[in-house]
Design a protein with these regions (language model features):
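Glycine-rich phosphate-binding loops of nucleotide-dependent enzymes
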Residues: 2-511
């Protein structure tokens, strides 16, 4: 046992039924280092982190913190050991202030001295370079500010070992850079940090070492300075990986969808889309970029008939230029009218698929209304499920297994495969590769390009700007429910898109 290790895992194993999530894993985290954890979906990264944080308990193995063997049976145990975890989905109370969230749940007697506590929190924030108004309520904050609250909350509770799950998933490039500066400051102060991410360039820019897992097994830990994106990818998948994203030239481009003056409000009567005008062309991939909550999700849902429209028009044009108005139609009406539109939602299990149902039954969700018999036809959906499993290499014991048991990447393959099988004229995809490993991401990029070549109008909300710039023909940037710019994917830069994500000025071209 090395004295310089803040954390060491020895021979850790964890299984869920017949599924071996972690298989005799060894891992070390040095004091004052940033360690990246890499692996494909289903490689056991999250399970391993959840055992360190006390959400799961290992079946076998030993955990050491600062050289001493410990037992972690709950997040309370991890807190007491100085371990904190910031999940991808934040655990905050919207109606409380930042300061109130940071101290929420801490032991104490009587009334809290919030003035003194706020001063202490502010000193901690200033120490590491956080910029945050502690008096603001959570619902008033941006995603990056909410993440800041989560990190400060862990530090205030004494965390010296910090685990971050996909920390930049919904941040702009500028926000990501600020976060990296803060993490480097924390490292200088003696904190040890573990990050789970699929963004290889961020791993190379930020981490000191990289640990790789594959199919539940520990593969190796390498010094970041001696690695590159290609070598890390090959270690993750166990073979050669092509990291290039193709962008074939658009052919026979024609208007497919015309959106004019689109306005939407949420249940609280707050405007989510504000006078949006946009043309979507057949035979192209239109990328939608923006900070989380800028209206991207609502834009796709409005087209798909899942979002009430206050005003405006959404016109679907056929090959002869004849238009069908979609505004005012719900998703069932769109389906019954035979309009060939497919939608891959952000919420894969919930809105997209039913987690407790198997692949065959999830295929039927798209077709059961079209049956002419009182009995459900399972032959077609079963054949489609088998085809998707084979062609997209879906990792599942059987098509009869509930999709909830699959990793995120395999769930996404099932969902995208089902929607593409409808032969749509318009394909709407929200966050196609969020939380998805490199190999699966490239499978999905290939599928989207195949649809583009077939003349489908593809609209993609993508959070990774590197991917947006490599994959998309045009990029519409949303900010505060408005379109702040429409750029050519071949000439735009990451910095330009990042700035447009924080501006409300209209710009760009509809061409």
């Amino acid at each position: 046992m090395g004295e310089n290790y803040a954390l060491e895992l020895r021979d850790i194993s964890k299984s869920f039924g017949s599924v071996q999530a972690n298989d005799h894993v060894d891992l070390t985290l040095r004091k004052s280092e940033i360690l990246a954890i890499l692996g494909e979906n289903g490689s056991g990264k999250t399970t391993l982190m959840n055992m360190i944080y006390g959400i799961y308990y290992p079946d076998e193995g030993h955990i050491f913190v600062n050289g001493k063997e410990v037992t972690i049976r709950s997040p309370k145990d991890s807190y007491e050991l100085g371990i904190g975890m910031v999940h991808q989905h934040f655990k905050l109370v919207d109606v409380l202030t930042a300061a109130e969230n940071i101290v929420l749940g801490l032991p104490g007697k009587g009334k809290l001295d919030m003035k003194r506590i706020t001063e202490d929190i502010q000193k901690l924030a200033d120490k590491y370079g956080f910029e945050l108004d502690l008096s603001h309520k959570i619902y008033e904050m941006s995603v990056s500010q909410k993440q800041t609250v989560e990190i400060i909350k862990m530090l205030y509770r004494g965390a010296r070992i910090l685990i971050l799950d996909e920390p930049t998933a919904v941040l702009t490039p500028q926000e990501s850079d600020r976060l990296f500066d803060i993490l480097r400051n924390m490292r200088k102060d003696g904190c040890s940090i573990m990050i789970i991410t699929h963004k290889l360039q961020e791993v190379l820019a930020l981490s000191d070492r990289v640990a790789i897992l594959r199919k539940g097994k520990y593969i190796d830990t390498v010094e970041t300075a001696q690695a590159n994106a290609q070598s890390l990818s090959e270690m993750m998948v166990g073979g050669r990986v092509d990291l290039n994203i193709d962008r074939p030239e658009p052919e026979n481009v024609k208007k497919r969808l015309v959106v004019k003056g689109l306005n939407c409000k949420n249940k609280e009567e707050v405007k989510t889309l504000d006078d949006v005008d946009l043309i979507v062309n057949a035979g192209e991939i239109l990328g939608i970029a923006g900070i989380s909550g800028s209206g991207q999700k609502e834009f796709l849902e409005a087209i798909a008939g899942l979002q009430a429209i206050e005003s405006g028009s959404i016109t679907l044009l056929d090959d002869n230029g004849k238009g069908t108005e979609l505004a005012g139609m719900d998703s069932i009406s769109i389906n019954k009218a035979g309009i060939s539109l497919a939608f891959v939602p952000e919420d894969r299990i919930g809105m997209g698929l039913v987690g407790d149902m198997d692949m065959t039954d999830n295929m039927m969700l798209r077709s059961y209304r079209n049956g002419k018999s009182p009995f459900l036809d399972r032959k077609g959906p079963k054949a489609l499920a088998l085809k998707i499993k084979e062609q997209l290499e879906v990792m599942t014991p059987s098509i009869s297994a509930p999709v909830r048991q699959m990793s995120g990447g395999n769930v996404q393959k099932v969902l995208v495969g089902r929607e593409i099988a409808q032969n749509p004229k318009v394909l709407l995809v929200a966050f196609p590769t969020r939380g998805v490993d490199v190999n699966t991401s490239h499978v999905i990029y290939r599928l989207l390009n195949e649809q583009k070549k077939k003349g489908v109008a593809v609209v993609c909300v993508i959070e990774d700007l590197d991917v947006v710039l490599e994959l998309c023909d045009r990029i519409a940037v949303f900010c505060g429910g408005k379109i702040s710019g429409i750029e050519d994917g071949r000439t735009a830069t990451k910095e330009e898109i990042g700035l447009l994500m924080t501006k409300h000025e209209k710009g760009g071209t509809q061409a």
